[in-house]
Amino acid sequence: MYKRQGLDYKLVQQAYVGYVYGDSTAGQAALYGVGLSGIPIFNVNNYCSTGSSALFLARQAVQSGTIDCAIALGFEQMTPGALDILFEDRPNPLMRFYDEMTSLQGFDESVPWAAQFFGGAGNEHIKEYGTSVETLAKIRVKASKHASKNPFAIFNKEVSEEEVLGLSLIHI
């Protein structure tokens, strides 16, 4: 399905590798495994914005003139269901957000964290900017259309606006 586009690895001067659930040097492990080494490899972890962040950083490095060629890639191995704490041997960086969210909107043990984070953000966007629920539904529909083209995406079922609007809203 995926094929190499003929880029000679010798041209790559920096790599930006996005993932969330891998351990600290998963980018190096992935790139060394395909023979790409001897360059700076930056591991990027920005939760749901990880892929976009890796691409932005690679683009920024090229645009700045620091380098001529960068590679951005991402990978993740997720399991079905709600996101969970994977590394219990260290503090979870989301705890500050969790504490703040809990003080602002409360916390419902029966609803996954991510749904409450994004649901709360959606509610605040609606309040501050007057965004309609229909507009947010259209965003979900567009995301599902793109995800449906990736057989490895965890949520790869295309959904309609009517389906999205028929779901329960998270208001805490």
PLM features per residue range, with description:
Residues 17-71, 77-117, 154-169:
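Conserved catalytic cysteine-centered active-site region
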Residues 8-14, 38-40, 134-135:
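Short acidic capping loops at alpha-helix termini that bridge into adjacent secondary structure
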Residues 1-5, 170-172:
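Conserved small/polar residues in nucleotide/adenosyl-binding loops
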Residues 3-11, 125-130:
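Phosphate/pyrophosphate-binding loops at sites that engage ATP/ADP/AMP, CoA/4′-phosphopantetheine
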Residues 18, 73, 139-143:
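Short acidic/histidine-centered micro-motifs embedded in hydrophobic/aromatic stretches
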